Structure formats: C-alpha cells, structure tokens
Design a protein with these regions (language model features):
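Hydrophobic alpha-helical segments
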Residues: 1-207
Length: 207
C-alpha cells in the first residue's frame, strides 16, 4: 500500500546545469532512461564521483556486452528488491521495458521460478542475484556451479557487475532518500504496485 510518504530528501538534486563538465554523461543517461536521474543530480556535488559512476554504469550497460541489456535490468531489479530499494526497483523496471523486456515478462518477475516466460538460465541467474544481493551474501559454490552451466566467464563477470553496481546504488539512494522522478513513479505504479511496491520516502518533491 502506498502510504504517501513525503519526507524531504537528505540532499537535494541540483540542476543539471550545475556541472557543465558532466553534460555528456547526463545526455547518455537521458538517452538510456528518458530523463536524468536525481541520484546523479545529487552526486554531482563531487563531479569526480559522478563521472566515475557514469563510466561504471556505461560499462555495465555496454551495448556490446554478451548478456541481454533488458535482462540485465531484470537482474538489477531483483537485486534491488532484495535490498529493499524502491527507487532502484522503479528505475530497473523502466529500463527493462526500454530495452526490450515485454510487459508481461516484467509483471511475472516475482513468479520467475515458475513462470514459463523465464528460461532455466534466467531462473538460475535470478536465484543467484538474490543470494548475491543478500546481507550477508548467501552465494554458495553449488549455486555458482549452476550459473556456470548457462553462462561463460565473461558473461558471469557482466552479471556480477550488474549486481555490484546496484549494491552501490541501493545504498546511495536509500541513505539519501533520493526523490523518484515522475517517469519512474509512473512505471512503479503501473507495473510494481500490485506486488507491494510504493514510492515511500522517495515520493519527496512530488506531492
């Protein structure tokens, strides 16, 4: 249930014009998401940190990667739900749709273990993502061996890269109560609310 929390962000997003040296990164994010995320607009107070995150994000989402870019967003979504980050759940849901995941597959993500829309390789990967995103980490040798049955070592590096990126982003956005953008809230309310998602503290600056 959406409790309409309207707490103030702990740090306010700054206008994108604040950091001219980051404009190329901002435009790349706008192309991928349809908007510039408030997380990076907060982070630009330290441009080197914002630039490093932008470069890491670009590498994780590399269009020349060997793991489907839409499915990578699903991995990030499952990892973010495991961590409890409503902000990143909305962003990854929108990203999944933007990069080719069908509505019905996104809607079935929390029944992935039984849904015919998810392959054995995808189910194994999402089990792994939950274990890797848990605190403490619960990945086992057997789990990793199962992952190896479906992916090359290069692909496994990409998968762990996604989970690790969201380990950072989940903590960043939950700690700073980053306000969700209108576009992300709309995605969350359409596709995630029926599974218990709410903007919660990330609704700040919207209501």
């Amino acid at each position: 249930m959406d409790q309409r929390t309207t707490s103030s962000p702990r740090l306010m997003p700054l206008p994108s014009e604040h950091s001219p040296e980051l404009q190329d990164h901002f435009e790349a994010m706008r192309k991928n998401l349809g908007f510039i995320p408030n997380s990076i607009l907060i982070m630009q107070r330290r441009p080197k940190l914002a630039r490093a995150l932008a470069q890491m994000t670009a590498a994780v989402w590399d269009p020349e990667g060997k793991v489907d870019r839409g499915f990578k967003r699903i991995i990030g979504h499952v990892a973010s739900r495991t961590a409890g980050c409503q902000y990143c759940m909305a962003h990854t849901a929108g990203g999944a749709l933007r990069f080719g995941i069908e509505d019905k597959k996104l809607a079935a993500v929390w029944e992935y273990q039984t849904s015919p829309l998810y392959s054995t390789a995808e189910r194994t990967t999402l089990d792994f993502a939950i274990a890797a995103a848990s605190v403490p980490n619960t990945v086992t040798d057997d789990m990793f061996a199962e992952l190896r049955k479906h992916w090359t070592e290069e692909q496994i590096v990409e998968i762990v890269g996604v989970i690790s990126l969201f380990g950072f982003l989940n903590r960043w956005n939950d700690t700073l109560t980053t306000p969700l953008e209108d576009e992300a809230i709309a995605i969350g309310e359409q596709f995630l609310a029926s599974h218990g998602w709410s903007p919660g503290k990330h609704r700040a600056l919207v209501d």
